[in-house]
C-alpha cells in the first residue's frame, strides 16, 4: 500500500529521472566519416599523437563532433593503440 502510494505520488518524477538517466547512458560508435578523419590525423602524427587545441578545433569542425568527443577519442586511441618509440 505504501509502495503504491509513493509510486502514484512520484511516478512523474521517476519517469523523468529514468529518461534522463537513459539519455546519459547512451553509448555508441562515432560516425564512420568522423573516425576516418581522426584516423588520418592519427596515422600522419603517429610518433606524437597529441593534437594541439587548434588541431582539435579543426578536427571538430571537420567531423561535426564536440571537442570533448575529439579529446576522448585521442585519449582512448593512445591508450589502446600507441606504443611510444
UniProtKB/Swiss-Prot annotation:
Cite the Pfam families for this sequence.
ELK (PF03789), Homeobox_KN (PF05920)
Q: Which InterPro entries does the entry mention?
A: ELK_dom, HD, Homeobox_CS, Homeodomain-like_sf, KN_HD, TALE_homeobox
State which gene encodes it: LG3
What SUPFAM superfamilies does the record tag this protein with?
Answer: Homeodomain-like
SMART domains (alphabetical): ELK, HOX
Sum up the protein's function in the record's words.
Probably binds to the DNA sequence 5'-TGAC-3'.
Tell me one GO molecular function of this protein.
Answer: DNA-binding transcription factor activity, RNA polymerase II-specific
Q: What is this protein called?
A: Homeobox protein liguleless 3
Please report the organism this UniProt entry assigns to the protein: Zea mays
Superkingdom of the source species: Eukaryota
Where is each ELK domain found? 1-21
Subcellular location, record wording: Nucleus
Magnesium in keyword set = no
What cellular component GO annotations does this protein have? Answer: nucleus
> Could you tell me which residues form the DNA-binding region?
22-85
What keywords are annotated for this sequence in UniProt? DNA-binding, Homeobox, Nucleus
Name the family the entry cites.
Belongs to the TALE/KNOX homeobox family.
